[in-house]
A protein has these predicted regions:
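A general, composition-driven signal for non-globular sequence regions
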Residues: 5, 19-20, 61
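Bacterial N-terminal signal peptides
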Residues: 13-25
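Bacterial Sec-dependent signal peptides at the C-terminal "C-region" and cleavage site
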Residues: 24-34
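Extended, charged catalytic domains and RNA/DNA-binding interfaces, predominantly
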Residues: 32-419
Length: 419
């Protein structure tokens, strides 16, 4: 504690110091105000310090489905799906619709957006078969398909298998039947009718269904535009090319020629047998910088989860992750022609693909797998249903009913690899 004498002495010392400073002031006080006091003009104008000031950031989480099939997809329409794109958009808006099995369906919560993504290959074939379309019947293979699907039973299964075979080989046995142009034009106009900016986004897309050797490298293309632009093109099919680099060229040409926007995403790497996120291109050459730049430009997201299995990781890759076994589908490739091997897994799943991308970036300077993630249904019912207590299945045959999980969607080439 300071004594009264010490406090008095301290005050005297501070007073003396202040007086000493004041004695120095005359030489300064004689200067003009402009020389001693900074003026606003002395400092150049500058932007605000915070680079994020006055910026608006998204503050709403929107939910939707970016991968849904209707009766326009051959593997849906030929296996019992009758719901149309119009039905799909109505259901997504929260309306009650009648399902393919005749049951009422309504979502728990309406979606904010929906992308209908029917297969580009033979789009609308099922509709043409049901209508006995003259254009289809004038084609020898088209007539054969119509006869076999009309007969039903094993003949219908054989006809369906032939379509799957065309998807595996890229063999277009129908040729140019003008099927796609009218059907696609009607579809994109349907999306425009249901689109309500700020309330519900009815978007168009298609699935490019390449699976060379039965290995799934499917991509879903999603357009940001209306029919005025999407109506200028037709979907790009595996019958045009099985090489994803050609799909990217199609997308580039679309944007250049229409001024529109399009992106794509790969799904079900778990059924690719190591080809989804490989270090090798489709042509067998190593991934290079040009490939990496094109891939991340046109495929900025990956579909990480859907009905045909979860694509985040695998117990073999993440042995300490207790959730790595979630919804696995890892027996073989898509058509059940080749079994899975452990060395394939790191090139199939999203988490390990991020690591592969970093390895490639260290060598190439570009990361082809620096993507974001989305999850979709890939339902082939026209119904974007995923809730456990409101689930209407993958196909029309798996809609609610006592036998919904019986039978096969597709017969595996190798019976041991049941699909």
């Amino acid at each position: 504690m300071l004594s009264l004498d010490r406090i008095t002495s301290l005050r005297s010392l501070l007073a003396g110091a202040a007086l000493s400073v004041l004695c120095l002031q005359p030489s300064i006080s004689g200067a003009s105000p402009d020389e001693t006091n900074p003026q606003p003009s002395d400092f150049p104008a500058r932007k605000v310090y915070s680079p994020h000031a006055n910026q608006n950031f998204p503050d709403r989480v929107l939910f939707g489905d970016m991968h849904l099939h209707t009766n326009l997809s051959p593997d849906a329409g030929l296996l019992g799906t009758s719901l149309t794109a119009e039905d799909a958009y109505r259901a997504a808006r929260g309306r009650t619709v009648t399902s393919n099995s005749g049951q009422p369906f309504q979502l728990v919560r309406p979606l904010d957006f929906l992308v209908v993504t029917d297969h580009a290959e033979y789009i609308g074939l099922a509709v043409m078969i049901r209508e006995a379309n003259p254009i289809l019947l004038s084609n020898p293979h088209g007539k054969w398909l119509w006869e076999n699907f009309t007969a039903g039973g094993e003949r219908a299964m054989a006809a369906f298998a032939s379509i799957v075979s065309d998807g595996t080989t890229g063999n277009d046995r129908l040729g140019d039947t003008d099927m796609g142009s009218t059907i696609w034009g009607d579809f994109v106009k349907t999306a425009d009718r249901f689109n309500e900016p700020g309330v519900f986004s009815a978007m168009t897309g298609f699935e490019w269904t390449s699976m060379p050797g039965g290995n799934n490298i499917h991509r879903v293309a999603v357009f940001a535009d209306g029919a005025d632009k999407t109506g200028q093109v037709l979907p790009f099919s595996l019958l045009d090319s099985q090489n994803p680099e050609d799909l990217w060229k199609y997308m580039e040409n679309y944007e250049r020629n229409t001024g529109g926007r399009v992106l794509s995403h790969l799904h079900n790497g778990n059924l690719s047998n190591g080809t989804a996120f490989s270090k090798t291109r489709f042509n067998g050459k190593p991934v290079d910088a040009a490939y990496a730049e094109a891939r991340i430009r046109w495929e900025p997201i990956m579909e990480i989860s859907q009905i045909k299995g979860d694509g985040e990781t695998h117990p073999f890759l993440s042995p300490d992750d207790e959730f790595a076994d979630f919804e696995r589908w890892d027996v073989g490739n898509l058509d059940g022609s080749a079994p899975k091997k452990d060395e394939m897994l790191q090139y199939e799943y999203g988490r390990s693909a991020l690591k592969v991308g970093l390895e490639l970036e260290a060598r190439l300077g570009v990361n082809p797998y620096q993507f974001g993630f989305n999850a979709s249904s890939d339902a082939h019912t026209g119904l974007a249903s995923t809730a456990e207590d409101n689930y209407f299945g993958k196909m029309a045959s798996s809609e609610p009913g006592p036998n919904r999980f019986d039978g096969e969607v597709l017969r595996a080439v190798d019976p041991a690899l049941r699909i």
